[in-house]
């Protein structure tokens, strides 16, 4: 299984700990950065993780920023992503089993590394429970997404992504 992971500069150490944990469990980790503590912004990393999951390059994603709020909002803007910001096992399992979440988000300064690893492990192992009710809920979420599919400026991230491709991971 391939897991995409991304973070901002505030939680690089926490992301590396999670990445090492996932590798120790035998998962392939695709690390979308950031890789140091130079100031950067989470939307790029949420976008990268989300696009990897939607395209099939990764099976699931993990997004981490200081509180988790920003990067989780960013990744949820990628069409086809259902990400849950969690800090406990119950929420993570509900997200996967009932809403078929494909990305999990954390506040790396809110949730400790060991707890994040335990939650991620349970999230990965949990299975979506396909019921008529769950399918209807997911369809309603997808409808909201498709209803607003036309971005005002589809090239908004182009400059940032070009910098990324050149190895410039910060402002």
Curated annotation (Swiss-Prot):
Pathway in which the depicted protein is active: Carbohydrate metabolism; D-galactose 6-phosphate degradation; D-tagatose 6-phosphate from D-galactose 6-phosphate: step 1/1
Alphabetical keyword list: Isomerase, Lactose metabolism
Stored SUPFAM superfamilies: Ribose/Galactose isomerase RpiB/AlsB
Molecular function (Gene Ontology), one example: ribose-5-phosphate isomerase activity
InterPro entries: LacB, RpiB_LacA_LacB, RpiB_LacA_LacB_sf
Keyword Isomerase: yes
Reactions catalysed according to its record: aldehydo-D-galactose 6-phosphate = keto-D-tagatose 6-phosphate
GO BP terms: D-allose catabolic process; galactose catabolic process; lactose catabolic process via tagatose-6-phosphate; pentose-phosphate shunt, non-oxidative branch
EC number: 5.3.1.26
Subunit-level organization: Heteromultimeric protein consisting of LacA and LacB.
Family, as annotated: Belongs to the LacAB/RpiB family.
Protein's name according to its UniProt entry: Galactose-6-phosphate isomerase subunit LacB 1
């Amino acid at each position: 299984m391939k897991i995409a992971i991304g973070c901002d500069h505030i939680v690089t150490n926490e992301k590396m700990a999670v990445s090492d944990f996932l590798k120790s469990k035998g998962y392939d980790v695709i690390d979308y950065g950031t890789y140091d503590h130079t100031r950067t912004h989470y939307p790029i990393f949420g976008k990268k993780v989300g696009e990897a999951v939607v395209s099939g390059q990764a099976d699931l994603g993990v997004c981490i920023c200081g509180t988790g709020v920003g990067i989780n909002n960013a990744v949820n803007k990628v069409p086809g992503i259902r990400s849950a910001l969690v800090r406990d096992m119950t929420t993570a399992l509900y997200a996967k089993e009932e809403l078929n979440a494909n990305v999990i988000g954390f506040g790396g300064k809110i949730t400790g590394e060991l707890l994040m690893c335990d939650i991620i492990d349970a999230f990965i192992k949990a299975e979506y429970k396909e019921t008529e009710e769950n399918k209807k809920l997911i369809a309603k979420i997808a409808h909201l997404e498709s209803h607003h599919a036309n971005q005002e400026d589809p090239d908004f991230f182009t400059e940032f992504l070009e910098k990324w491709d050149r190895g410039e991971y910060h402002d």
